[in-house]
């Protein structure tokens, strides 16, 4: 009897060590590739950073220049996409959590939202191209903003839905007992309780769409000039990085690495700020 118990204990102990070892190996493999990517980005991107990046537009081959037009274009496109997508996402998430809750329509909407959340970004770009760009017969900054908004909306919907569902029903019932309407309860109670989580979701969504390239290839494309007109093709950092990284010109390659470093630093800082802000609010 004791022999069988010892064997079972030995097998469980061995099995535990084996699985723990495999887990460590998996973590090491994942961190290895991440560290390699970051190391390559730092060694090639950081040395390429200079003041010219922020004062000059993208140059012709073998000439000095910067990424000013691409930075401004990305700011406009990402900003417009955020302004378009955030209200839609928050309102849709509010309906799912406060009005639809567990209704069949809400469940179907959540399912469709999850599909859109996992859809490849290039599919979104093709959709906007066929719906908008092909109709106006030219690329447009607004088309790029619309494509990024479609990528941002499902993230904000899911975050808003989850955060509002975490608000205790006792708060809603107490407000209703004081004579508040449902919309007043949502605005004054639920939003205040969930605002940190909703803001976190919005910031993480902005971090995600900031580096998207595929949708912009089919919508905003790019140009070589400093442009403020969102009705025309407008330069943006992801597409410039894609074009310059694939070019045979060394100066363009260096600008691509510098642009990649800028996007990475922006996303990193935004994620750090989001986590610190969220922890502080807790």
UniProtKB/Swiss-Prot annotation:
The keyword Signal does not apply. One of its GO terms (cellular component) is plasma membrane. Keywords: Cell inner membrane, Cell membrane, Membrane, Phosphate transport, Transmembrane, Transmembrane helix, Transport. One of its GO terms (biological process) is phosphate ion transmembrane transport. Pfam families: BPD_transp_1. Its main location: membrane. SUPFAM superfamilies: MetI-like. One of its GO terms (molecular function) is phosphate transmembrane transporter activity. Belongs to the binding-protein-dependent transport system permease family. CysTW subfamily. This is Phosphate transport system permease protein PstA. It comes from Haemophilus influenzae (strain ATCC 51907 / DSM 11121 / KW20 / Rd). The gene is pstA.
């Amino acid at each position: 009897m004791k022999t069988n118990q010892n064997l079972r204990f030995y097998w469980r102990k061995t099995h535990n060590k084996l699985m723990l070892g495999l887990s460590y190996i998996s973590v090491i493999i994942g961190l290895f590739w991440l560290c390699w990517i970051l190391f390559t980005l730092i060694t090639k991107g950081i040395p390429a950073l200079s003041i010219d990046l922020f004062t000059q537009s993208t140059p012709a081959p073998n000439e000095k220049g910067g990424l000013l037009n691409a930075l401004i274009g990305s700011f406009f496109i990402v900003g417009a996409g955020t302004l378009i997508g955030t209200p839609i996402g928050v309102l849709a998430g509010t309906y799912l959590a406060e009005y639809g809750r567990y209704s069949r329509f809400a469940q179907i909407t959540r399912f469709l939202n999850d599909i859109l959340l996992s859809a490849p970004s290039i599919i979104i770009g093709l959709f906007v191209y066929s719906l908008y760009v092909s109709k106006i017969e030219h690329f447009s900054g607004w088309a790029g903003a619309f494509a990024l908004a479609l990528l941002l909306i499902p993230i904000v919907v899911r975050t808003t839905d989850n955060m509002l569902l975490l608000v205790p029903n006792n708060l809603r019932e107490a407000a209703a007992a004081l004579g508040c309407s449902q919309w007043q309860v949502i605005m004054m109670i639920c939003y205040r309780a969930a605002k940190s989580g909703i803001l976190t979701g919005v910031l993480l969504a902005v971090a995600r769409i900031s580096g998207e390239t595929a949708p912009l290839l089919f919508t905003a494309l790019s140009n070589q000039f400093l442009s403020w007109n969102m009705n025309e093709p407008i330069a943006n950092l992801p597409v410039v990085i894609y074009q310059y990284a694939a070019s045979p010109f060394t100066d363009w390659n260096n600008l691509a690495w510098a642009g990649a470093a800028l996007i990475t630093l922006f996303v990193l800082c935004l994620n750090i700020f989001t986590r610190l802000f969220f922890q502080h609010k807790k």
